[in-house]
Amino acid sequence: MNEITLMSFGYVFGAPEGADTVIGTRGLPNPYWVEELKHKTGLNQAVRDYVFSTPEAEAYYESCLDMLRRRIAFYERYDSPLKTPLRIGIGCTGGKHRSVSMTVRLAAALEGEGIPIRVLHRDLDKTLEHSAGAVVFTREAGEPRFVILSSVFGNPGFPKGHIEAGESDRDTALRETEEETGLRVRLLPGFRAVNVFPLPNKPNTWKQVIYYLGEYENQPLRPRAGEIAEARLLPYEAALSALRFENTRSVLREAKTFLDELPAASARSGGH
């Protein structure tokens, strides 16, 4: 029998190269949002129990197992001098909880049926920090003006912060925007941008920031003292030039494209 590998991975770190089949697990219950489980991994039984705690999750596992049985049977029947090892990627957001749980359980079931499995957990040693924020704008003479904040450390960007226990990412975006700018914004439906980048001062640590698009009217900017050195309201091109990092510029470009394609009446009708 040729080598068969099941590899867990995190989508934020990229899909695994050379995977013949990829199984997604992002629809399963996520232990990250359970305080006593978030710092554990899918190698822990309590985490696996949580991931497969619903009838839908159990049914999805069974369908994945059945699919792999058929995929492996087809692979074993295939005869060619160019035949390569079979690689199955199993992904979730960060590669620590759901994908690892599914990989462990599928591998155990297949090995119990006499199928040797090589198991790899590609991103288990990586840490993913979760934050959320908003690209905040108002309209002047029909054109958007964007709020650009400069922290006391000098890095210009958008209001954002860590997602607290019990918060949704939208809740965090609203809270952080009000705390850092003094603005109560309306999140426009349909926009969600994700920014992922490594933290240079933390080995094997990445940050994922989910951005929404927040609109406000007739409110003064009140930047948070001691944290925000400057808050500017800029037209698009000036805002783009003010941002130093390409991943942040990319979020602003997405927001501007979204606004350009959105009728003004629809933008004004958005809600929390």
Which residues does each predicted region cover?
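Unchanged
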Residues: 161-253
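Hydrophobic anchor at the start of a short beta-strand
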Residues: 116-118, 132, 185
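N-terminal strand-loop-strand
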Residues: 127-159
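Catalytic cysteine-centered active loop of the rhodanese-like fold, especially the PTP/DSP P-loop
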Residues: 81-108
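C-terminal accessory "lid"/substrate-recognition subdomains
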Residues: 1-86, 113, 123-125
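Post-Walker A helix-loop "phosphate-sensing" segment adjacent to the P-loop in P-loop NTPases
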Residues: 107-116
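Charged phosphate-binding loop/patch that engages nucleotide di/tri-phosphates or the phosphate backbone
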Residues: 119-124, 241-272
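Extended hydrophobic secondary-structure segments that form protein cores and membrane-embedded regions
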Residues: 87-92, 120, 148-149
